[in-house]
């Protein structure tokens, strides 16, 4: 069912000149725990991966966790989700909603919760939300190379802690 929905998404919403999301072809491969997509700017991965994963989340009930480096970037993910729905029009944007909690933001479409947004500094607190997080097993951490002062301390360990809270 996953491959069928992914193929449908790619055919209808993914222009040929952009990143063709080959990593998603292997998303259900039990031999692979995580994927890295390292490409130049402008190939569409920062729009097309989130878009396709939100689409699949809605249609297949596979939740997505968007992780950002700093709390202030959570708003950018909210804006990206709205932009995706307005641009591709695969769902009525007026049915999009957000619910804030202390540690994450829930993204919903209609009656479904399809994703959450959190930041790396919530890694320790998120372990107390593992009952919720387990429903959002696909983690998207789309970050660019930053100036040395923009990185947070223990960045890798914090991402690993979030992964462990989800992968129970």
What function would you assign to each model-found segment?
Residues 33-106:
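Conserved P-loop
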Residues 102-156:
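Conserved RecA-like ASCE ATPase "motif II neighborhood" in helicase/translocase motors
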Residues 13-17, 46, 152-156:
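A conditional alpha-helix N-cap/helix-loop micro-motif detector
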Residues 24-27, 55, 128-130:
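Short, flexible, glycine/charge-rich loop motifs used to bind or transfer phosphoryl groups or to couple energy/partner
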Residues 27, 56-57, 162, 166:
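Hydrophobic helix-cap positions at the C-terminus of alpha-helices
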